[in-house]
Amino acid sequence: MESILEAINEWIKEILIGAINGNLSTMFGDVNEKVGTIAAEVGKTPQGWNANIFSMIQNLSENVIVPIAGLVITYVLCYELISMVTEKNNMHDIETFMFFKWFFKAFVAVFLVTHTFDITMAVFDMAQHIVSGAAGVIGGDTNIDVTEALAAMQEGLKDMEIPELLLLVMETSLVSLCMKIMSVLITVILYGRMIEIYAYCSVSPIPFATMTNWEWGQIGNNYLKGLFALGFQGFLIMICVGIYAVLVGEMVLADNLHSAIFSLAAYTVILCFSLFKSGALAKSIFNAH
């Protein structure tokens, strides 16, 4: 009779351990997949992320915003010409060189507006190069060996009794569900960043039209800072993901499985918070506001 009870006990333990291993395998697999997914998403340029959206934004910019930018250029250049003429002792000390300077500024302003998308896409091409380099380092150094991680836990799981194993099943199931929710939030952050990039690019001709004027040029300068901040945000996101993967990799070796499971949940929450803050951090680095 006692041997039958022991066999039933072992059978139940094997079922629970199998469920725990399944949950842990899913969670660790999600970590590896998340690193690769985020690297792939933040490494895409606006053209590569969605060609149809990019084409729509480009058409809107060229057909709707560029004419407005032309009006802005006209106003800025007229203001610039009046300022240049009147500042020289009420037009008594006019030099022909200043007209050459004015024509040069006009040429630069028109060139910037007509090549706005080339300039903005160059910024994100550079950002893609940086993110791709970071993804190669981070992805290679932080990939978790799921099989090895699970093998290291088997002895500890076999020593546990049914109540503790049942508790672990509940904990791993709960944390696995939380990680799925966090994955949705991370997707929202990544998609939100790309939508912000498209919105930013759609109005780019207007700030570019102001860059040749000393007073109005602050608009264009701040726009460029924000543009670089959006591109550099991808690199900061990769750093956050790399730190997350390293923390999870070290957590696998923890002796207390209960603590390790909730540490994983805490690290995932911290990752989401860090991704939310990455945009503000990038803007503060470039002093964009």
PLM features: residue spans?
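Gly/Ser-rich, low-complexity
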Residues: 1-72, 87-97, 107-178, 217, ...
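Residue-level signal for the membrane-embedded core of alpha-helical transmembrane segments
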Residues: 65, 69-79, 103-107, 111, ...
